[in-house]
Amino acid sequence: MRMDEYLRTVTEQVRCSRMHDSIAEELKDHILDQAEAFEEEGTDHEQALELAVREMGDPVETGVALDRIHRPHMSVEMLVLVSLISVLSLVFYGSMLVFAEDASINGMEYWFQQQVKYTMTGFLLMLLVCRIDYSVLGKWSRQIAGGILLFILLSLVTGVQVYGRIYGLRVGPVMIPTFGMIWLYVPAYAAVLYTYRGRSYKGLTGLLIWTLLPVFLVLRLPGLNQAVMLLFICLLLFSIAVGKGWYQVSPRKMLAAVWGMMILAPAMMLGTGMLAEYQVKRLQAWLGYGEPSYAAQTAYECLRTSRLLGASGNHVWQKLPGWNSEYILVSLTSAYGLLAAVTAVTLLLLLWVKMFHISSHQKNQLGMMVGYGCSMVLLAQSGLVLVMNLGLLPSAAITIPFFSAGGSNMVSSYILTGLVLSIYRYKDILPGNPVKRMHPASAE
């Protein structure tokens, strides 16, 4: 069999057409190397090629074996975890209808219906995003990130306000929540970092805009907690990129400057008058000043009287502000017992570990960084809500993925999860792109 016939037969067995060229090229190189070895033993060129092809084995069997490798995959473990978390969330809100006795209390029936609607919508979006090739983020990273920043800016100018805070931007009959879009900026930012590979100090100045502009815009919404979290995640992603040798800079000097800026950021915000008076007080509370709020004291009292298993009798939906958002874990504990909250946190932790494992084992550098970004968002939200529910941080408007009420929180969490599923799905299809470690340079 001729080499071109062999390669054609092999690639015909592989259903993923985008892999045909790379598979054919790899097999061709192997055949030519083997043929060269036969020629060194005295065999003429044509016969050497024929022998090399014959040693490759049956082309159909080879193609079928390669098809099993180079095809989209689904992370069943991750899908099961998300499904369990979604079901647990719906069970919790459904049970509140029973515990509340009167479904009209605090709009209990409304919250249950909203949770069902957004859980189903988010789950379907997750499956849709999973099927989309995540590499489009690398190709259109700046356009996507710029579009999200433009959306936030338009929200500031023409957005709908609720209690003095920008809620969302109305596009025709549809209201698009602004705060959900903030977290979708993170994977786009990770892709922007990828496009700056090989740059030196001068070439990286543009990254300052991509890093600080969204933080400034979020502060104006206003969203102090979200701005601090966003800045921390972006700097952490940038630090990973520096540590991986993506840029022609001194890692020590660059990381010292980056984290020095992070440490000085609160002082700069306080000193420049960027923050409103209530934001200053909130930042001071986070730094350890001030008395615990009513919500924090109520949450502590609910936890103190909770049981290991079973309802405590505390009607948290009546007396705890944020019972279905930032204090959702306290509500779970009051309704079902401490084990229920531990189960929820454990499932979220397992999901994050799985997401981080998928990201860290990517040969494709873009997939690795985007996966890290998605994982960090879910970890930061879950971790802050956990420590806040334990009384270790003051009360703040932070939501926990999949559980806290609100369509923007639900949908953004599912989309970020879908991106990680997409990274896993295409792990054996998109080529790896190892980055050579850069050395510091004075100019680009």
Model-assigned labels for residue ranges:
Residues 50-163, 343, 375, 410-439, ...:
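A structural signal for hydrophobic alpha-helical transmembrane segments in multi-pass membrane proteins
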Residues 250-343:
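Hydrophobic, glycine- and aromatic-enriched re-entrant/interface helices and adjoining loop segments
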Residues 117-125, 334-355:
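Hydrophobic alpha-helical transmembrane segments
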Residues 154-176, 277-285:
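Membrane-interfacial helix-loop-helix modules of multi-pass inner-membrane proteins that assemble, modify
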Residues 358-397, 403:
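Loop-to-helix entry and N-terminal half of a specific, functionally important transmembrane alpha helix
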Residues 205-214, 225-271:
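Hydrophobic alpha-helical segments of polytopic membrane proteins
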